Amino acid sequence: ETQADLPGSARHDRVVKVVNTKVQLDPFYAKFVTNKGSGVGEGYWEETIAPGVSTGLDPSTMPHELVNTGTNAFTFKPITYINRLVGDDETNSHPSFVGKKINGAFFHSNRLGFLSDDNVIMSQAGDFFNFYHTTATTITASDPIDLSCSSTRPLQLHAAVPAPNGLVLISQNQQFLIFSESGSLTPRDSRITGLSNFEMDSKIPPVEVGTSFYFVSKTPAFSRVFSYTLTGVNTPPNVVDIAKVVTEYIPSSITDLQSSPQNSFIVLYSETDNTIYYYRFYKAT
């Protein structure tokens, strides 16, 4: 059946499961809404959620927001996430971060994204707090994206950096690129490919400068700093050890990395030391 085969008169709020036999569509649930809003009568059917399934996310366990409410005044509060309104656990499943730790958050391509284990999860396009599909019958270009990185080793994604070709996904020992041949990340077109196997400190987020980003890699005795430039989807990235000329000069106690893209420099420092390590570069004209 299809929704068009359902009766035009029924009890208000009656829910049925529609299994399509004429077209290639997933089963879905429909709720009847009478014209008068109660009782039995004529009305229309609208797609709804399956009876008895969870309606969505628990805001108390999700990332919160810090809102500027005035001069030097901020409010830290839960976010109101959009509930699951249609489908069930098969046709409109929970995002893969449910029941797991979220290790990072970012905005990209008009979507809010989270990193959890080896998964990258991105919200509805233009609807940052909606991680569910709008319909269970088909996939739309604006629907959420939920993909995992294929690797032979366990990994935890902890950072994401925008790139001309897509988004670089970073774990402690591997880097990946999520991209789309069409140029726009969508549930159908998005792909993840491996880029490199550099060790990156998971507690110091990389910073962007122009078309490159910089990251810290530590040994027990000192820290190394690298620049990372993506050269294409199918070509190795250009990675340079910019601290090689001062090997073992930067201590392993470094806790933060910051950048000034406009002034073409990065700085490193430690919360336990008053020394700043400064690196500036000049672009050839």
Task: Report each predicted region and the residues it spans.
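Beta-strand-rich domains and repeat architectures in extracellular enzymes and scaffolds
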Residues: 93-118, 154-161
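Beta-sheet-dominated scaffold domains
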Residues: 119, 126, 148-285
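Long, charge-dense tracts
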Residues: 1-96
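A short helix->beta-strand "capping" segment at the edge of beta-propeller domains
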Residues: 77-100, 137-153, 249
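Context-gated lysine
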Residues: 17, 22, 31, 36, ...
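Eukaryotic alpha-helical scaffold "rod" segments
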Residues: 46, 53-68, 111-135, 216, ...
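Beta-propeller domains
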Residues: 72-87, 115-141, 178-183
